[in-house]
Regions:
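A bilobed periplasmic-binding-protein/Venus flytrap-type ligand-binding module shared by bacterial periplasmic
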Residues: 199-202, 391-403, 421, 476
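Short helix-initiation/N-cap motifs at beta->coil->alpha
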Residues: 83-93, 218-224, 314-328
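Hinge/lid segment of periplasmic solute-binding proteins
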Residues: 111-195, 271-274, 363, 373-374, ...
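Conserved N-terminal structural module of periplasmic/extracytoplasmic solute-binding proteins
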Residues: 1-122, 126-152, 497-595
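Glycine-centered hinge/linker elements that transmit conformational signals in sensory
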Residues: 222-226, 267-317
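Extracytoplasmic/periplasmic substrate-binding proteins
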Residues: 64, 114, 251-262, 295-401
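Long, aromatic- and glycine/proline-rich binding clefts that accommodate carbohydrate-like moieties
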Residues: 363-367, 374-380, 388, 417, ...
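Short amphipathic alpha-helical coupling segments at ligand-binding clamshell hinges
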Residues: 59, 299-303, 401-413, 486-489
Length: 595
């Protein structure tokens, strides 16, 4: 090739590169201009979330389209912009936007510190304690009709009950899941609820077991898994009884710890608050009751270990997506996951070649029966899902110039009709009274029957005790260590870790008091020097009572801790293991408190 031709080719490449650069630059400028135009308009609200699962964005898009059409009919041009952000980048994105003062109007709550709620979000109690106006408007429309269909009459009967209620009381859980005790406030309004179930391959069950019914007991879960494992080995095929990752293992741990140890949670709940807190957990350790050698705790760990023997090798390094991929490929008999994955799983299975597709069954994790030869003596019954609560919640940031419009959007989204519509498309479970889930989602409906609570080695949420327990738990479950090694390593390191966590709890209670007192004073001033109408005054009185409760708790927390330690010392166990633990703990605590 001649030199001139080479130079000509180089020039063309340079021109192409320059053209690409110009296009990208122009696109970036257009995006900035477009965003600035939107920000300058009073009728644009931006909504950010991390839900990238199949159907969720479509459900929100349909909701947005209907809301924009409604506002257009009312003579107002409104644009709602949906901004999905990958889960892994969500915290960084939201934090940057909030701190920089450029946050969207509404943000899905979660993945960021709770302190951000009080600093960057509007409290919503006053709005939530009043009726949702869309319900009253729809009821008035139906009442004006001289003739109503059967569906409309059913809807009218429902709305007669819901329309006068406070907005928060139209949620199945009363929106309790969105109450933030640290601020005694509500900051979020949710659209869905979620539960965890087991999915299974009916075709594979029929081939291996001769039937396609789910296991009815824990014993059958084990025997079915054994049969699938043996079938794979006999036919020299890669077949997993239970597709799993670290994520799924944690689900099993939570479920069966609850089923086997929830009675200990109630027993060690010294102040009868309804659950054992971190301080009470520590007191049980100092009494020699809460140890890795406690027979109930060990039984729960044995249950999880027995299930882990059916997980794939190296499951610790796998992600939730990896285990899901194995299941939809037909390479696993079962998988446990939440209702949020249901639509994605079903769609991916249907995308397989016809010969690889299979029918999916869904069942709840089977409970330990009272007749189980090893664990029946400890079986307390199934774990309740009463605390499933309302999720997929959005808060309104203090940076919005459209607060009322944001509230209106959330109210519109949480009518029975629209809540049904959004969740039908998303494949999730609705949360509003009267909203109807899809037929195949009824297996995911929260089951409130059962017990709550379990015992864990945790003194401070996310503290050093929990971190240490996690460090030794995973080698145990993956088969790298035996139980005695797990127990010894955990117990020997707990005194120092527990002392650090206890100090943080002890000092944290004192540091929180000033804010509580300020909040109490504000509510008290509103009540005493009010001049408000009766409804607002009643709201302020409720808030005053709520603010007093945590204040009294924080005022008495240190005295409670001191007295608990005194009682524990008076009734200290005398076995060598407990004596050594207590001595090490109090030495470490003395060091911590002196710093």
């Amino acid at each position: 090739m001649s030199k001139s031709k080479k130079e000509g080719g180089g020039k063309w490449i340079n021109m192409i590169g320059l053209a690409v650069l110009v296009v990208c630059y122009a696109g970036a400028i257009w995006n900035v201009v477009k965003a600035k135009r939107q920000e300058s308009r009073a009728d644009v609200i931006r909504v950010v979330h991390w839900q990238l699962e199949l159907g969720v964005r479509d459900g929100l898009a349909s909701l947005i389209e209907d809301f924009e059409a409604l506002k257009a009919e009312q003579g107002q041009s409104v644009e709602v912009v949906q901004i999905p952000i990958p889960e892994g980048a969500y915290n960084q994105y939201v934090t940057t936007q909030l701190i920089g003062g450029t946050a969207p109007d509404m943000i899905q709550i979660g993945k960021f510190p709770v302190e951000y709620l009080g600093r960057y979000f509007y409290p919503l109690s006053n709005k939530l304690q009043k009726p949702n106006p869309f319900l009253g408007e729809r009821l008035a429309e139906l009442n004006q009709k001289s003739e109503r269909s059967e569906v409309e009459e059913t809807q009218r009967t429902l709305l007669e009950t819901l329309a006068p209620k406070a907005w928060m009381d139209t949620f199945n859980d009363g929106l309790r899941g969105q109450f933030v005790p640290e601020f005694q406030e509500y900051f979020g309004v949710g659209f869905s609820t979620f539960t965890v179930r087991m999915y299974y391959n009916k075709n594979l069950f029929l081939k291996v077991l001769g039937h396609d019914r789910p296991p009815a007991s824990f014993e059958e879960l084990i025997s079915f898994s054994e049969a699938i494992k043996e079938y794979g080995e006999e036919h020299s095929i890669s077949l997993l009884p239970i597709a799993s990752s670290k994520y799924q293992a944690e689900v099993f741990r939570n479920r069966y710890l609850g089923e086997i140890t929830s009675d200990l949670d109630r027993l060690w709940d010294l102040d009868h608050s309804g659950e054992m807190d971190g301080v009470e957990s520590l007191m049980a350790m100092l009494r020699g009751e809460h140890t890795p050698w406690n027979p109930q705790y060990r039984a729960a760990m044995d249950v999880v270990q027995s299930l882990a023997s059916f997980f794939p090798r190296g499951f610790m390094s796998m992600g939730r997506e990896d285990s899901g991929f194995a299941f939809v490929q037909g390479k696993a008999g079962m998988i446990t996951s939440g209702s949020w994955d249901a639509l994605s799983y079903l769609k991916k299975i249907q995308d397989q070649p016809v010969e690889n597709r299979f029918e999916v069954g869904i069942f709840d994790l089977p409970s330990i029966s009272l007749t189980h030869p090893e664990y029946g003596i400890y079986a307390d019954g199934r774990l309740s899902e009463a605390s499933a609560g309302t999720g997929f919640a959005f808060g309104i940031t203090r940076f919005t110039s459209n607060f009322d419009l944001c509230v209106e959007f959330l109210q519109y989204a949480t009518t029975p009709e629209m809540n049904t519509h959004v969740n039908e498309i998303a494949g999730w479970i609705p949360v509003i009274t009267g909203a109807i889930p899809k037929e195949w989602l009824k297996n995911f409906q929260p089951n409130i029957v059962g017990y709550v609570g379990n015992i864990r080695f945790e003194v401070l949420g996310g503290g050093k005790v929990k971190l240490r327990e996690d460090q030794v738990f995973w080698p145990l479950i993956s088969g790298d260590t035996d139980y005695e090694t797990y127990a010894s390593e955990l117990w020997s390191s707990l005194p120092a870790e527990a002392a650090t966590d206890f100090k943080r709890l002890y000092e944290g209670s004192r540091e929180s008091i000033p804010n509580r007192q300020a909040r109490k004073s504000a509510y008290l001033a509103n009540v005493v020097f009010g001049g408000q109408d009766p409804q607002n005054r009643a709201v302020n009185e409720i808030q005053l009572q709520r603010s007093l409760q945590p204040l009294l708790l924080f005022k008495t927390t240190q005295k409670k801790m001191d007295r608990m330690l005194e009682l524990t010392l008076e009734d200290a166990p005398e076995d060598e293991r407990s004596v050594e633990f207590n001595q090490e703990f109090f030495k470490a605590l003395e060091r911590e408190m002196s710093q």
